[in-house]
Swiss-Prot record:
It holds the Pfam family Hpr_kinase_C. Both phosphorylation and phosphorolysis are carried out by the same active site and suggest a common mechanism for both reactions. Keywords: ATP-binding, Kinase, Magnesium, Metal-binding, Multifunctional enzyme, Nucleotide-binding, Serine/threonine-protein kinase, Transferase. Homohexamer. This is HPr kinase/phosphorylase. Its cofactor is Mg(2+). ATP binds at G161, D162, S163, G164, L165, G166, K167, S168. Its EC number is 2.7.11.-, 2.7.4.-. Belongs to the HPrK/P family. The Walker A ATP-binding motif also binds Pi and PPi. InterPro entries: HPr(Ser)_kin/Pase, Hpr_kin/Pase_C, Hpr_kin/Pase_Hpr_N, P-loop_NTPase, Ser_kin/Pase_Hpr-like_N_sf. It catalyses: [HPr protein]-L-serine + ATP = [HPr protein]-O-phospho-L-serine + ADP + H(+); [HPr protein]-O-phospho-L-serine + phosphate + H(+) = [HPr protein]-L-serine + diphosphate.
Length: 322
């Protein structure tokens, strides 16, 4: 991932209001950030933000009352040495939290070395938690996929398929049936956790759906506020096909999945043909997926019934025809 756009200035701009940050000194170092190597070797955002620790040179260092009290108890020689070590590590920036006053020597050294120094009245724990969450989102793996992303029965569903199959028309019909649009054509996905992928709409395409023959439709204006969603977790991919290929099975014994950002996502394949009610089929696929997530597998139940019937036909069919 390109980390050049992640610097002290961008982090300050994105978090100043929420964290009540003030930029005390070191404005010349606004371009300071994380190297690609630092980001690549970090196991999580916890490696990038934390309390004052000289062992982690590239971490955003947060100083609170405990750290400043410890500093005050040191001799002048130790104070100078610790401050010199801290600045020499070239952290992206420093934060003095908890409403405590920044030590004068720290302010002086940050000014001389162009090290950004922020202050905030918020507690160090709150600052660290917020910045870790922010860094997790900024540095999370992401990808853009083609399709129509919808909220169907509370589940994030991505409609995919070749151009001209009617994905947008199907999306429009599903919206008219009370479901919500997240994004059309291009969907930005980001993996924010170990077990979920979140999808959003690019700002340029917000609330818009393109339908052939009608052009661009503003779904929010036409159907109202409840017809659009800001984001959804991706749980199901519905692939539309003109005709089934050689691998298509009417009763697949194993669930199909698609790898999205390293996470397997359930997938169903629906053939597009004249007379088929695709909206009903998609809704049924979503309902079936919800049951599967709850541990209810209809196909497995049927196979169990079949096995029992083969073992003891009389118990399953007491009224056997003669």
């Amino acid at each position: 991932m390109d980390t050049s756009s992640i610097n002290a200035q961008s982090i300050f701009d994105d978090n100043a209001a929420a964290l009540k940050l003030s930029w005390l000194t070191g404005h010349e170092g606004w371009e300071r950030g994380f190297s690609a190597e630092t980001v690549a070797t970090a196991t999580s955002s916890a490696d990038l933000v934390g309390h004052l620790n000289l062992i982690h040179p590239n971490r955003i260092q947060v100083l609170g009352e405990a750290e400043t009290n410890y500093y005050q108890r040191q001799s002048d020689e130790d104070r100078s040495r610790h401050m010199a070590e801290l600045i020499a590590l070239e952290p992206p920036f420093l934060v003095v939290a908890g409403g405590v006053a920044a030590p004068p020597e720290l302010v002086l050294r940050c000014t001389r070395s162009s090290t950004p120094l922020f202050t905030t009245p918020m507690s160090p724990a709150a600052v660290i938690d917020s910045l870790r969450l922010y860094m997790s989102r900024i540095l999370a793996p992401r990808a853009t996929l083609h399709g129509v992303f919808l909220d169907i029965l509370g589940m994030g569903v991505l409609l995919t398929g070749d151009s001209g199959l009617g994905k947008s028309e199907l999306g429009l019909e599903l919206i008219s049936r009370g479901h919500g649009l997240v994004a059309d054509d291009a969907v930005d996905f980001v993996r924010l956790g170990p077990d979920f992928v979140e999808g959003r709409c690019p700002p340029l395409l917000q609330n818009l759906l393109e339908v052939r023959g009608l052009g661009l439709l503003d779904i929010k204006t036409i159907f109202g506020e409840t017809a659009v969603r800001r984001k959804m977790k991706l749980k199901l991919i519905v692939q539309l096909v003109r005709r089934p290929d050689g691998e298509f099975q009417r009763l697949p014994l194993e669930s199909q999945t698609v790898d999205v950002l390293g996470l397997p996502i359930s997938k169903v394949t629906i053939q597009v043909a004249a007379g088929r009610n695709l909206a009903v089929l998609v809704e049924a696929a979503v309902r079936n997926t919800i049951l599967q997530l709850r541990g209810i597998d209809t196909l497995r139940d049927f196979m169990d019934r079949q096995r029992l019937a083969m073992q003891d036909p009389d118990s399953q069919f007491p009224g056997k025809l003669i």
